Amino acid sequence: MKIFILLLLLSFTTLASTVEDLINESQEIVGVQSRTEYFSRKFLGTDYDPAGPLGEGLEGEIDQDPLYRFDRFDCTTFLETVISLARSRDSEDFNSIINLIRYDKGEVDFLKRHHFTDLQWIPENIHAGFFKEANRNFFKDDEIFTARADIDIKGWINKFTIDSLRLPSLTLEEKQRRLLNLKERVKNEPVREATVEYIKIDRILENPDLLSTLPDVVVVNFVRPNWNLKETIGTNMNISHQGLLIRIKDQFFMRHATQVSPLKVVEVHFLNYLERFKNHPTLKGVHFLEILEH
């Protein structure tokens, strides 16, 4: 166990140095959106991690994966990392910002993490001043639809097993104790409705010019209205994936950590990507967030 902790401490020291290097390399790039484009391009080719590569670090009660890393991402941690770097002047800035993006008021705790994009991640990060809703600013009212889902955090946690915990150095007995404690903490958690506005994929494919007024760099969320996942994860939800749209020579490309081959951060033509979801039974639309400057 001591060796495990020592290795983690060494890796954290290396990561802090990496943050400083990344930020120093980007000093001449001005503006959060421009810096977001820069850092998202820098991480193209990075491995996708289906298990979720980030946690609460060494002090984590449930997930002791690192608070940040640069060698692997899922779709959300890719966004969180890139935008945190884009807004930072040094490693101290970065540590503070990534925690604010990932956690309620920046308090590092598994149950305060923004696990649900529609219920937590979007509204909390709008409130924190990192984003603002783009749909109402760039699309007409008759082009906007609303998805609703009941988010059952207690039902989600009750689906957790010992294998859901990321606690490599703990005994089975201690893991069981922590799992029981986690379920106890959410026993009175109410079901809450999450709403998110979206533009239909089919409508965008019919009229790609709808995208023409969007900013050059924007967050895109993929909407599956009231997606029924109760049997698998214990709750419904509205959003299944996230990425960044980047305008390149008057066309939008999406950079995202993909869970299908090649399992890496990739850049794809956005309209071509949407084509595969035409008339899809559950994936109906996209939601946009404008990235705010400082």
For each predicted feature, which ranges?
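C-terminal soluble interaction/assembly domains
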Residues: V218-H294
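Sec-dependent N-terminal signal peptides
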Residues: I3-F12
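Helix N-cap / beta->alpha transition motif
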Residues: A194-N207, E267-H269
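Start-of-domain marker
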Residues: L22, S26-Q27
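Boundary at the C-terminal end of the N-terminal hydrophobic targeting segment
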Residues: A16-T18
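Sequence/structural signature of beta-propeller domains
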Residues: V32-D49, P53-L58, D71
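Generic recognition of flexible, low-complexity loop/linker segments
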Residues: E206-L210, L229-T232
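Acidic/His-rich structured neighborhood in mature extracellular/periplasmic domains
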Residues: A51-I201, S212-P215, R224-N226, I239, ...
